[in-house]
Structures are given as C-alpha cells and as structure tokens.
Amino acid sequence: MPAILDVHGREVLDSRGNPTVEAEVYLEDGSVGRAIVPSGASTGSREALELRDNDPKRYKGKGVLQAVKNINEIIAQELIGLEALNQYTVDKTMLELDGTENKSRLGANAILAVSLATARAAAASLGVPLYVYLGGVQARELPTPLMNVINGGKHADNPLDFQEYMIVPLASTFKESLRWAVEVFHTLRSILKSKGLNTNVGDEGGFAPYLEKNEDPLAILVEAIQKAGFEPGKDVALALDLAASEFYEDGKYILKAEGKELTSDEMISLLEYLCDKYPIVSIEDGLSEKDWDGWKKLTDKLGKRVQLVGDDIFVTNPQILAEGIEKGIANAILVKVNQIGSLTETLDTIRIAHQAGYRTVISHRSGETEDTFIADLAVAVNSGQIKTGSLSRTDRIAKYNQLLRIEEDLGEAALYRGILNFKR
C-alpha cells in the first residue's frame, strides 16, 4: 500500500473571499490528493474549532496561517510513512496529536483538509473515483437536492427570520431533477423582478428579496413551481431551514418579521400550520439547539409527517447524535464535514444515523469552495439527500456538475429515489 511521502498546507480563499485551508497529500507512488475546507455563517455552539489567526492586520483577523503552519510543521511529520489507504489510522493520529475535544490545538480546518486530501490521494493511487473508494460497490444512489433559492436570517439583509427556503425536485433521475430545479429558479427570478424585488444572489446563490413575513417566500415558491409548469408537492416540493438557534433568546423565539415572541409550543404550532398549507417535506433546525424538550415535542408532533433535520443540535457529532436518538429527537441529521473535523468521524456519524433509521443530508457551508468532495461523499454513503446551494455561483454548481458526472459514470446502476427519501 502506498505510504504518505509529504503533506503540504496553504492559505487560499473561500467563496466569500475569506481565507481557508487547502492541503495536499503526496504518496510514494506519485499520487496526489488535494482538499479545501469550507466555513459556515450560522454555526452550532458545539462545532469543532475552526482555527483563525485573529491578527487584525491580515484579512481582518480571519487568516489561517497558524492552521497552515500546524499542517506543515506538526501534522506532516507525524503522517509521513503512514499508509494512505488506512484512513482511520491517519485520522486517529491527527486527533491524538491535537488532544482536545474540539480540535482547538491544531484546528479542525487543518485536520479536515489533510483528512479529505488523504482520501483523495488514496483513491488516485487505486485509480478509482472518490465515491467508489469511499463507498465501494454499493455506492450508487444519487442524492435528491434541497436547493436554497430564497435566503433570510444570517444569509440575507432582509426582515426574514428563517434562513433558507428550498425547492426539492422529484424527477426520476438526478439529471432531470436538476433541469426542473433550474427552470423553477429562473421562473422565480422573473416573478421577483415582476414584483419589483431584488434579484441579486447571496452567499449560497439564492435570492434575498425584501419580503416582510416569514411565510411570504413559501407562497412565491409555490407560484414559481406552478408557472414553471410543475405541480407543487408532486413534481417539486419545499423544504425549510429555520436556523432557529439564531433567533432564540431567553427561552423564546423572537420573530422580528412578525413582531412576535413565541414559546416552543407556539413555534411547533406555527410549523404545523405551514406544513398543512404548503408542500413541505423537510424542516431543518425548526427549534433551537438549546431547546431539547421542545425538539422532543416537535418530533412527537410532526416526525411522522415530515423530515425533521438536526443541524446545530447535532453538529455532525456521533456522541451528540447518539444522545438525540436515545431521546427521540429529530428523524434526520445534517452532515457537515467541518462541524466534526475529520472524515472518519463523519462516516461514524452517518453510520450511527443510518443504523437508527435516521436519514442523512450531506451539506455544504455558506462559505464554500470549488472542492466537490461532498458530492462524492453523498453517493458513497447512499445518503439520498444533499444541500449544496442554489442554481448560481460556481462554488455551488461545481457540486451539481460532479453529481452529473457520477450519474453518467454509474450508468444503469444509478439510483434516484426522489420523493421516496422523504416518505415517513
């Protein structure tokens, strides 16, 4: 098996123009793997630590030279000579080297970049696609995309409290679903223009129009689906990411758009009302990461009707997820590789979720890059769902294009389950 010959890190930029970490892993047989890590805007309080320099003279404190230095001067020395195909040993070595619960010594961004680059180098050495290396012969399911086309919350400068309003295309193949979504996206742009609303796009490629009520985007999306020639709920469904932790204060949910302060029970009633009125198949972070009792009530109330995705509450952490499963909280988990900070731990989380009957949604971050690792990962683990932004911005489209390539590569073996991924 090929051993690691060298590891190199560098500071590059993400889609928001902020520094991030890129790593390259070189093997003795000449194979090379490269990976760039993303960065989030709304983050869970228990995420692994993204190491920043905090030097106000460089990139307003957001530089990552220390993380890069940790790769080049600490991590590299420990990994040289290890077998690249033994991902567990590579990751375990870095985790032990860091020695902290949240990867604060070396930085989750440093560890993850090397972890993902190692997997790429191993796949290159074997001469197989990344999704095949990660998932083997069973890696054949293309994910249904949840596409963030209207932004609110921390992703936009508008009154909306909810962070993401998504369309979910339900065709018979990924390629056809992507086409349907693009047609709805461009129809949505025309509708927003006709209403005199802003059609500039945000971090994730979605629109951020000035809408006054949290329900308004749902009505506009239904209109866009219909005008594009599709049936809401049957051809194209809807999904929400409230990022509710961002507007949770002192035990109340502060909805500034409506001028209301809601209890957990009232928030649950609001979500139930929206599910009754609109073809919503998935709700992410419907309640705060601190509101575990509320999450249990939400799951009991809506868990048999819609997918309830835990993001901030689980932060892709296998131990926290196991606790949530035991308490009957949510029925799906959002998987972000940089929340936990290594490929091995990410795969552990996915395994625990699937064994418990929880669905997994592989996800990007708002600060993305041209790296397409998560597209391969979604197919490798047969996740069945992916969140990687809207239908604009190359950093988002890159993942969709990679999925098109994978679907073509799989040929007749490719599976696309569409609405079946959301059936309770």
UniProtKB/Swiss-Prot annotation:
- Per the UniProt entry, the disulfide pairs are none
UniProt keyword list: Cytoplasm, Glycolysis, Lyase, Magnesium, Metal-binding, Secreted
Give Gene Ontology CC terms. Answer: cell surface; extracellular region; phosphopyruvate hydratase complex
Q: Does the keyword DNA-binding apply?
A: no
Give the annotated active site.
Answer: 204, 336
Q: In which pathway does this enzyme or protein participate?
A: Carbohydrate degradation; glycolysis; pyruvate from D-glyceraldehyde 3-phosphate: step 4/5
Cofactor binding mode, per the note?
Binds a second Mg(2+) ion via substrate during catalysis.
Record-listed (2R)-2-phosphoglycerate binding positions? 163, 336, 365-366, 387
Q: Which residues bind Mg(2+)?
A: 241, 284, 311
Q: Where in the cell is it found?
A: Cytoplasm; Secreted; Cell surface
Q: What is an annotated GO biological process for this record, any one?
A: glycolytic process
Task: Identify the cofactor(s).
Answer: Mg(2+)
Q: Recorded GO terms, molecular function?
A: magnesium ion binding; phosphopyruvate hydratase activity
Which reaction is catalysed here? (2R)-2-phosphoglycerate = phosphoenolpyruvate + H2O
- EC identifiers of the protein: 4.2.1.11
Catalytic EC class: lyase
Q: Which CDD domains match?
A: enolase
Per the record, the similarity remark reads: Belongs to the enolase family.
Functionally, this protein is described as follows: Catalyzes the reversible conversion of 2-phosphoglycerate (2-PG) into phosphoenolpyruvate (PEP). It is essential for the degradation of carbohydrates via glycolysis.
Protein known as: Enolase
UniProt source species: Dictyoglomus turgidum (strain DSM 6724 / Z-1310)
Taxonomically, what lineage is the organism?
A: Bacteria, Pseudomonadati, Dictyoglomota, Dictyoglomia, Dictyoglomales
Query: Which gene is this protein's source?
Result: eno
